[in-house]
Every structure is written in C-alpha cells, then in structure tokens.
C-alpha cells in the first residue's frame, strides 16, 4: 500500500489499482483493460484503464489470469515464483515485501526534475534484527544482461537512488509505515 492505494499483482504484474475513498466510504478499482479483453492499448490511451467493481474482479479472475499468463515473460514468472516460494519458506532469512517498486513523486514536474526512473524487482526485509533491506534485481537468461534494462542500467539506477537519498528519505519510511 502506497499513496492511499494498493496495486493488485499477478505474475509480478500490476493488474489493478484499488483505492478506498474515505469521503464516499467505498472502494474504487481500476484495471488495465488488457486483462479483461486481451487487447493491447497504447499507454496514453484513455480507454486503457477501466473502472470495475471489486466483485467483478473476482468473477473475472480466470480471464485475468489467462491474459496475465499470456503476457508474462519467463523472467516475470521466475520472479513471481521466487517471491511466493521464499515467503512460504519459514526457514528463509528474508521476507519479500514488495515487487516492482517505483519511487513515487508528487507530480510529473518533480519526477522530471529528479531524472530518476528506476524500478526494483523485489524488496525484501530480513526476519532477524537488526533488520536489513534488500533491493533485488532479477535477470533471466543472458539476453537480459545488456540493453536498456540490463545490469549496467540497474547499477546506475541503484547508485542514483542512494545518492539522491531516496533510500534513507523515502523507502525506509514507507517500509516502517
């Protein structure tokens, strides 16, 4: 949960945004239409997101699951399996608390000025005190090492994340809250 909403994930893919509207005393759900109809939409297309009743998400679960499975890459499937198996393992020293973490900004101007667009595959917290935080990037196959989301890019992102104080200033606080 972050910024008064939570993301519903399947295959480490954000399926829906779920938000409690205190003023209206109701839950709003918004889903990427791909998971309902299997059609890909332009990211700027206003038709891409769809308001949906929470009961409808449950009714459509098999359809959503099917489309997510079609979209999931081997890396995403491995990431999802790693998180699930780790968190089910009582003997693990770590507990995965978040997937696909993106630093939030107050607005687009702040985001542009920050010049930071990094994303971490998994955030894990050690079970033993003193607690430690692990920012995990998973790569699947040699083809995932180079390119725009390769190892070098993630090292740069991690360095920027630490240099700009995002770990101490925001992530730590989000974990505590």
Go through each PLM region and give its residues:
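Charged, terminal alpha-helix-loop-beta segments
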Residues: 1-177
């Amino acid at each position: 949960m972050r910024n008064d909403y939570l993301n519903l994930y399947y295959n480490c893919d954000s399926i829906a945004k779920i938000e409690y509207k205190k003023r209206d005393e109701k839950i709003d759900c918004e889903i990427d239409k791909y998971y309902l109809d299997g059609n890909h939409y332009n990211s700027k297309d206003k038709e891409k997101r769809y308001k949906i009743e929470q009961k409808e998400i449950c009714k459509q679960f098999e359809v959503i699951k099917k489309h997510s499975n079609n979209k999931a890459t081997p890396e995403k499937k491995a990431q999802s399996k790693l998180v699930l198996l780790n968190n089910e393992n009582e003997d693990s020293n770590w507990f995965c608390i978040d997937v696909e973490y993106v630093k939030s900004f107050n607005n687009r101007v702040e985001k542009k000025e920050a010049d930071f667009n990094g994303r971490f595959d998994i955030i894990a917290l050690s079970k033993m005190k003193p607690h430690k935080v692990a920012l995990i990037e998973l790569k699947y196959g040699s083809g995932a090492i180079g390119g725009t989301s390769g190892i070098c890019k993630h090292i740069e992102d991690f360095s920027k994340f630490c240099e700009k104080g995002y770990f101490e200033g925001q992530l730590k606080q989000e974990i505590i809250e």
